[in-house]
Structures are given as structure tokens and as C-alpha cells.
Amino acid sequence: MQTLQQVENYTALSERASEYLLAVIRSKPDAVICLATGATPLLTYHYLVEKIHQQQVDVSQLTFVKLDEWVDLPLTMPGTCETFLQQHIVQPLGLREDQLISFRSEEINETECERVTNLIARKGGLDLCVLGLGKNGHLGLNEPGENLQPACHISQLDARTQQHEMLKTAGRPVTRGITLGLKDILNAREGLRKTTLETNSLAHRTTW
């Protein structure tokens, strides 16, 4: 089932998305939720954390999965996906280290893909994948092209992606990323894709 909702602005989109995420967490306290990073989901995560604290929702059984990461950057740098999730999800919710399945950007190779894929499988797979749509159409760091990779892989970044806002503090070119593949994303039981445009905001919810 696919549901496409158009709301009046980014704030309304973020509020609606946070309500949906909270409903998933309430219905399945041990849910495995894959999270995108960057500007699009930022306010959603702020609202979600706020609601969890206000309503005293138990998050001790949750597992979050980092969708992607830049390659060859220390995880502690400000522009990494790791730093983003630590600042906006992990620390505000007081999560344990084992509640985040995360790529280690200093150790990137195909073994890292296998490690993360196996950890997700041991948890029973993804219940929900939160996505943003990149300016060039990428999902995660699956760049548009003729040869899309179904599984977790190391990707060569498109020129536009290399200019991503998160990389402005990198201090050096970043040309590769690691990401869950399109099959990994589609294997999630539900998907929540958020798109913000100059004139409107869209939330696209899919149950596979």
C-alpha cells in the first residue's frame, strides 16, 4: 500500500512524519528503524525526541540503523552521518551503544558491508526506513545511474553529492560513500520518504 500526502510546509511535514514514527515505536517497541541524515529529516527527529520525552515512551528496546556514511572521514567530524545521529537521536534519547547499527567510516571495505548487513539480519530486518530524496535523485548514497546496486555497497559520489551541505566542513574532497542498497531499503516492511520542494512538501509512505 502506498500513501502520498502533501502538506503545506516543511514544519507540517516534519510534524506529520514524527507522529508516524512515534506510532511505529508504540506499536512495536523493539522496532528496527533505518534513519537518513541531513536537513530534510532534522526537524522530524527534533519533534520525535520531544514527543518521546513528553509522553515518556520507552525506547530501550529500539534499534536504529544508519542508512549511509561518507568514506574516509573520521566519525567524530561535524559533517558525518554518525555525528548527526549522535547529536539528534542517540544522545537526546540516551540510547546505548548497541542500539545504533552504524558504518565505521575509518574501516570501509566490503567486509564492513557484510558486517552491517548481518547485524540487521540478526535483528529480523528493517521495520521502517526513513528516507530523504537527494537533489540529484539519490536515495541514501545510491546514486542515479544505469547500474544500481541492490545490496549494501561502496558508491562513487556524484559531483552534486560531493558538494553536499554536510561536507562543507570536511576540509578535503570526499568522493565515496557507503550505503544500504536499494534491495535493502525495499526489504524494509515500511518506507517513509520525505521530499521538500520550494512550493510544497510531500510525505510518501509505502508498505511492502
Could you say what each language-model-derived stretch is?
Residues 136, 140-182:
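Class I SAM-dependent methyltransferase SAM-binding "motif I" and its flanking Rossmann-like core
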Residues 27-53:
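Glycine-rich N-terminal segment of FAD-binding domains in flavoprotein oxidoreductases
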Residues 36, 40-44, 119-146:
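A glycine-rich beta-strand to alpha-helix segment
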Residues 34-38, 66, 103, 130-133, ...:
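Short beta-strand segments
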Residues 183, 187-208:
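ATP/nucleoside-binding phosphotransfer catalytic cores, i.e., glycine-rich phosphate-binding loops
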Residues 47-58, 81-83, 144-154:
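A glycine- and small-aliphatic-rich helix-loop capping segment at beta-alpha/alpha-beta transitions
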Residues 1-33, 110:
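N-terminal glycine-/serine-/threonine-rich phosphate-binding loop
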Residues 1, 57-130:
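Ligand-binding beta-strand-loop-alpha-helix segment within the catalytic cores
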